Amino acid sequence: MAKRPVATSSDDELPFEIEEPVAADERAFFGGQPQKPAAANAKAALPASLAAQEHYHGHRERLRDRFREQGDTALADYEILELLLFRLIPRRDTKPIAKALIERFGSLAGVFGAPAALLTEVKGVGEAVALDLKLISTVAHRTLKSELRSKQVLSSWSSVIQYCHAAMAHETREQFRILFLDKRNVLIADEVQGRGTVDHTPVYPREVVKRALELSATAMILVHNHPSGDPTPSRADIDMTKVIIEAAKALDITVHDHVIIGKDGHVSLKGLKLI
């Protein structure tokens, strides 16, 4: 959510604050060699740890076969995550880990959006696995961003929202992001201008406009997230947006919209006719 100004920048501009071993056979002592177990009983004679490994390796193959033959629609979210964890944790049963991650963070998106420090709090997830999960998340974000670069942003609005949601919806702190556009409304730069706390982040309107001039941008889309999940704008969100619009207008820079991202949706201030 957003708050009124609480601090100053280096230029005295008041900022707006926008608001996871088998025992020996005794028969050997009475002469003769110990009898070998029958082939049919060989599996039962395996140590418990080896039997468990045999079971989950068989499970892995069955899960891979389902994915190969039927695609992702045949698998639950935790099974998709389990398939991935096969590669990251090769010698363990990853099903309990996948289920624990989904339970902790609520969804696949929640898992990949969670900070690495929180991921390592889940039993079975070490620093290396957490880093790999964040790397996969980064690849997904970069893929979505690359799709925006060759398009006119305003005519690809669903792609804009999809990218912003993937990048920001599961952040645990508020961040203020700006999409800078050229005269054809093609993306020039996507920059995080500020990071704050769980319910606010400072925004300096003059710095926003200054950065647009440095990039030779002629338009902007403002975006910030609400970690609470509720994208409803606060009065300070609206007021801050209007200040930026006026400052940008004086330099012939257009602010197309201010979008607020929540876990389950988004709000467009322009769509609500608030700007």
Swiss-Prot record:
| Pfam families, per the entry | RadC (PF04002), UPF0758_N (PF20582)
Keywords annotated in UniProt = Hydrolase, Metal-binding, Metalloprotease, Protease, Zinc
Residues covered by the MPN domain: 153-275
Any one Gene Ontology molecular-function term assigned to this protein's record: metal ion binding
Q: Does the keyword Electron transport apply?
A: no
PROSITE patterns, per the entry:
MPN, UPF0758
Q: Which GO terms describe its biological process?
A: proteolysis
Record-linked SUPFAM superfamilies: JAB1/MPN domain, RuvA domain 2-like
| Record has Metal-binding as a keyword | yes
Q: Which residues bind Zn(2+)?
A: 224, 226, 237
Indicate the segments annotated as coiled coil, or none if absent: none
Residues spanned by motif JAMM motif: 224-237
What the entry lists under InterPro entries is as follows: MPN, RadC_JAB, RuvA_2-like, UPF0758, UPF0758_CS, UPF0758_N
Q: Which family does it belong to?
A: Belongs to the UPF0758 family.
* Protein's name in the database: UPF0758 protein Rleg2_1511
Originating organism = Rhizobium leguminosarum bv. trifolii (strain WSM2304)
